Amino acid sequence: MALSIKHPEADRLARALAARTGETLTEAVVTALRERLARETGRARVVPLRDELAAIRHRCAALPVVDNRSAEAILGYDERGLPA
């Protein structure tokens, strides 16, 4: 199967790589594609922090309430905010 890329920068980059490595144009392109695919395959997809925090927030909001006391009561603070 033939691959035809009509992009001036792609042509320039492929030729520069082939000249630097001593490979044919085809070898340079195939090697570059293999290396990029290997990097992408081994890399975990990065989830934006905002999305990750939203997922945590949704999971926490779905948890059941197991203690109806206020946070202060659970921590043992009195009406002045001091430990009781």
UniProtKB/Swiss-Prot annotation:
Entry's transmembrane regions: none
Gene Ontology biological process terms from the UniProt entry: positive regulation of growth
Keyword Ribosomal protein: no
Keywords: Toxin-antitoxin system
Domain of life: Bacteria
InterPro entries: VapB-like
Purpose of the protein: Antitoxin component of a type II toxin-antitoxin (TA) system. Upon expression in M.smegmatis neutralizes the effect of cognate toxin VapC30.
Name under which the protein is recorded: Antitoxin VapB30
Lineage: Bacteria, Bacillati, Actinomycetota, Actinomycetes, Mycobacteriales
Gene that encodes it: vapB30
